[in-house]
Amino acid sequence: MKRRFTLLIFVILLAAVSCSPASEVVPTTSTTAGAPLPTPRLKITEAPDAQTAAESFLSYWQAEDYENMYAMLARVSRDAIPFEQFVARYKEAAASLTLQELNSQVLSTLTNPASAQVAYRSIFDTSMFEQIQRDMIMNLVLEDNTWRILWEDGLILPELSGGNRLALDIKSPSRGSIKDINGTNLASQADAVAIGIIPSQVPNGQAGFLLSQAASLTGIDLRTVNNIFERDFNEWYIAIGEALLQSVQDLQGRYPSLINNAGLQFREYSSRYYPEGGIAPHAVGYTLSIPAEQLEEYQRLGYPNNAKIGASGLEKWGEEYLAGRRGSSLYVVDPKGQVVTRLAQNESKPSSNIYTTLDADLQAEVQRSIDGFKGSAVVIERDTGRILAMASSPSFDQNLLDPGNYNSIYRQGEIFNSPDLPLLNRATQSSYPVGSVFKIITMAAALESGLFSKDTVYNCGHEFTDLAGLTLYDWTYAKEVSPSGDLNLMEGLMRSCNPWFWHIGLELFRDGKTNYLAEMARAFGLGSSTGIDQVPEDGGSIQDVASEGDAVQLAIGQGTMLATPLQIANMVAAVGNGGTLYKPQLVERVEGLDGTDVFTFKPEVIRQLPISPENLEAIQTAMNMVVNNTRGTAYRSFLGMNYKIHAKTGSATTSAEDPHSWFAGYTDEGRQDLPDIAVAVVAENAGEGSEISAKIFRRILEVYYEGQPRTLYPWESSFYITSTPTPLPTNTATAGPPPTEEPTETPQP
């Protein structure tokens, strides 16, 4: 029936069309037969991909790009939380988690016309806990054809929904100790006492007794304590030093009157303690509170906000060992501060102790040996690279950097405001021209070049005229002594003849070996760091030789060349041990959690010196002649000393009136009980090497081999007591003294 009805309608419509007159059919448009129709214009809008939006948000989170994360929030979410609070939520969570790395991935997507849900998984790698993993749901809404995030706290962790927060409870182990090679503490956590004197409260006749007790407690030399007392006598309070609480209690047990003596003040504190006002403070270093700009970084490592960290030296290098592993529990707390659940927990592990290569007794004496000068002295075990002492002067008391120490109020300015820069480690951070000490390298280059032999003779006169238009003068000219005359090469080093070495530098340059001397210096370890990584280090400077003037300057250790005392000590050690350049090291071992060592010292070879055994022996012999031959520049400084010493004097001219005083050498005793050592000493703008640094070198050997000084300095009335004002340079030291550009006419030996 339906089919018939449809057919009837079709017939009626057909009849109606056929009955219409043809003349009434009028086209609606005027078109030419066969003309193409216009191309339809279609506009297709693609639906945005919710998964792509979610992945972008998670990628921004991983990069901690909070600005772009916030820009992806829906309007209602941005209205609910300001940008600053949004960032704070993520940073607080990251700090509590001790987050180190975040990885997220989308698991699935459910999309509706105007909303979507994206399931994702986040994996949190933390420094304090095992890996934390959570599966979460992200809700999105379509706004202006763009997917936006409906944000809430649960997008960080599901446990944070409803305004919950994370809370981290940290338990830190006691910081490990830094010790010398024999186990003597150089830094430790301890109950300490700040010791000072109120001059107006000192009973008549008791000042000497109180000062001697203060010196005994603090380990500071009595002379130094007396000087502090005399200098600050008119002050209300005189800060003397620090001591262990137990030591003070023991002394008070022997002298009960000390407790009631108002003149001697004791103020207790508990913190990092450095004995005797700092033994090797530049090498050991110190701790400080976490700087504000690094607080977030250390929070993520599990440090509490009030923690102290190693700020320099071995305290900084060994932070991971010394800090141990902090125990911690991670809680979820509700808006009222009530614990909801514990997310993670780990147990603390004890810290480790660092045993240095330093000998505390030797170090203390080396520090005293250069006290009063600006400069440095370094003692290295010749055949291994162990650093036995590293002293920089002026020194400083690390205890004064602790705000818990009452004395820091009164004396911290001595450290930070001093023009002598006591915090600067001159042993490794100050580079100097080294003067005639460099002639050791020049002699090596001369012998290895084939242009000279140890028997080559040169006439050492007052003048050197081989440079056109310039006359240079030997040190004997300024001293008004006879010129040295004919000298073979070994005697040239012994006499430190400047014309001899100017001649070598010039001949190497003119023979086409323009950089031969510079390359030899680099092979001896100059011009780059030694590789010690336990303290900051300057690499010095050895530049290519560009002219004849450069050549003669470099040959005597002047011009643009610069080196640190550590580099020079390491260099002469290599000469003395047969040609092996070792990496200097400060750490003997690190004692692990179970008493076993997690690090043990091993000698590390940098390279072999590029010099034949025969030529090296010639240099060694010449260095021995410097000390033992009656014409040697250091002969008088070592009269009566019977040790086998090989050394070289140096006086490096600077822009100041007086040169830097250098002396560097090594011993060759071959003893089993005391290894041979190499020593470098520099005293800034103090005078000639033979007159100042050679004397300091001698004292260091006396202390090393005999346990105490035996020979007075010319400027002492008794050991460490000056009969005339201590030579104190007037220039302020810098990490790199300005080089002298033109050849020096009267360099000193």
Can you say where each PLM-predicted feature lies in the sequence?
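C-terminal motif of bacterial Sec signal peptides marking the signal peptidase cleavage site
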Residues: A15-S18
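Beta-lactam-recognizing serine transpeptidase/beta-lactamase-like catalytic domain environment
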Residues: V333-L343, D383-S436, I441-V682, G689, ...
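Short, gly/Ser/Thr-rich active-site loops of penicillin-recognizing serine hydrolases
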Residues: T32, P38-T39, D597, I696-P749
